Design a protein with these regions (language model features):
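Short hydrophobic/aromatic patches at helix-to-coil boundaries
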Residues: 87-93
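Conserved beta-strand core positions
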Residues: 22, 39-41, 69
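Helical scaffold of the NTase/Pol beta-like nucleotidyltransferase catalytic core
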Residues: 1-21
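Catalytic metal-binding acidic patch
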Residues: 26, 32-50
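Metal-dependent nucleotidyltransferase catalytic core
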Residues: 45-75, 80
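Short, charged recognition helix plus adjacent turn
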Residues: 80-87
Length: 93
């Protein structure tokens, strides 16, 4: 699945969870994906959300994409990885 195809499937889910900003990073963006690669997604919600909301988003994305998904928030990025991730991210929302 290419980036545009991912975006088309992901956006309706992100809108339901009131995500105001989102990006894909990792192997999909770097062109290193394999058949069993997960999809790494960064999100920022419109308002305060709970850990259950984040888990619900992850589960729904995995069901939608039929693939393992890692969901991180922009605020949760580790300082040592933040610059690299932000440089390679492909904004989808």
């Amino acid at each position: 699945m290419e980036l545009q195809g991912l975006k088309d499937k992901i956006l309706p889910v992100l809108e339901r969870y009131e995500v105001k900003r989102a990006a894909i990073f990792g192997s999909f963006v770097r062109g290193e994906k394999k058949r069993n690669s997960d999809i790494d997604i960064l999100v920022e919600f419109k308002g305060a959300k709970s850990l259950l909301d984040l888990a619900g988003l992850k589960i729904e994305l995995e069901e939608t994409l039929d693939r393992k998904v890692d969901v991180l928030t922009y605020k949760s990025l580790h300082p040592l990885l933040k610059d690299r991730i932000l440089k390679e991210q492909k904004v989808i929302l």
